[in-house]
Amino acid sequence: MAKSLSYADAGVDIDKANRLVDRIKTIVKSTPRQGVIGGIGGFGGLFSLNTEQYERPVLVSSTDGVGTKLRVAIMMDKHDTIGIDLVAMSVNDILVQGAKPLFFLDYLSMGKLNENTAADIIEGVAEGCRQANCALIGGETAEMPGMYEDGDYDLAGFAVGIADNFKIVDGSDVGQGNVLLGIASTGLHSNGYSLARKVFFDHLGLKVDSYVEDLGMTVGEAMLEPTKIYAEIVRNLIRDIHVNGMAHITGGGIIDNLPRTIPQSCKAIIREGSWEYPAIFPFMKKAGDIDEMEMMRTFNNGIGLVAVIPEPQVQEALELMQAMGEKAYVIGEIAARGENDDRIEWK
């Protein structure tokens, strides 16, 4: 008589998944926030929205992943920071619209569930939530045999925040004479990794544990540097400075992202050489013989967030960033745009 088949025979271990949920419950407790109702394990995450401090509350949401930075984490077998990247990619997108992060959910899919790897990933997600001051209220971990190679996985994140309708930062107030304040990134963040991997691993033939003198660390360490979460920076900026627009510099670089917060009637003039480039960018540019505009449209090149502010408040903003221990630079200004002008002009 043929053996009776089980879900485990098909490659899905429900008991292992349940053990992971128990571990995650402990991790989630480290991300408390007013408004969270209950814990995880239910059919949905519950959040009680207190709107008393808002005249016209608006929920702001975003979803994103980490891209092929995951491949570097897998190559290094180091998974405890990739969750920070996941939170950063979605949270930074709602921060630049003036929203205060409320809660976050994650989706993790693996070919074969590895409890320790999954727990490390969720620990990173929780750390990202703590940095962003938002609650991790739920998620999904899917074991999907036949969909991924052994050891491979994918991540997606979902952030929800709140803003007052009349305080939403949408770029509508951006105008001629405004100044571009660039706030430093920590490195690659989570974009451009397909090209970065091409340079380091294919073109140069390096390994994740190869030490590079110009970088002062191994390739893997430089590439896995977590994405900066700008929650505290943005909170202080919009409290003290009249911020007319903000852009999270991700895929597409300054070229594609800054115009998203600038009216069609305006252009941004970027002053080349006005900020400090982390070592990884000039190294890749030289090693891969990458064109300057290709660099600018692929990577953040050292600027992870741009705030558009009134010229009279520039010094105050720079002093605020310095007091927070953050690197910030005046990288350009806003000017009137002619009929045939590009949205971005480099000088």
From Swiss-Prot:
A single Gene Ontology CC annotation of this entry is: cytosol
What Pfam families does this protein's entry cite?
AIRS, AIRS_C
Give the matching CDD domains: PurM (cd02196)
The record's Gene Ontology biological-process terms are: 'de novo' IMP biosynthetic process; adenine biosynthetic process
* UniProt subcellular location: Cytoplasm
Q: InterPro entries this protein is in?
A: PurM-like_C_dom (IPR010918), PurM-like_C_sf (IPR036676), PurM-like_N (IPR016188), PurM-like_N_sf (IPR036921), PurM_cligase (IPR004733)
What GO molecular function annotations does the UniProt record carry, in alphabetical order? ATP binding; phosphoribosylamine-glycine ligase activity; phosphoribosylformylglycinamidine cyclo-ligase activity
Enzyme Commission code:
6.3.3.1
Reactions catalysed, as given in the entry: 2-formamido-N(1)-(5-O-phospho-beta-D-ribosyl)acetamidine + ATP = 5-amino-1-(5-phospho-beta-D-ribosyl)imidazole + ADP + phosphate + H(+)
Keywords linked to the UniProt accession: ATP-binding, Cytoplasm, Ligase, Nucleotide-binding, Purine biosynthesis
Key word Ribosomal protein present: no
Keyword Aminoacyl-tRNA synthetase set for record = no
Q: What family is this?
A: Belongs to the AIR synthase family.
Q: What is this protein called?
A: Phosphoribosylformylglycinamidine cyclo-ligase
Native organism = Desulfatibacillum aliphaticivorans
Q: What is the lineage of its organism?
A: Bacteria, Pseudomonadati, Thermodesulfobacteriota, Desulfobacteria, Desulfobacterales
Gene field: purM
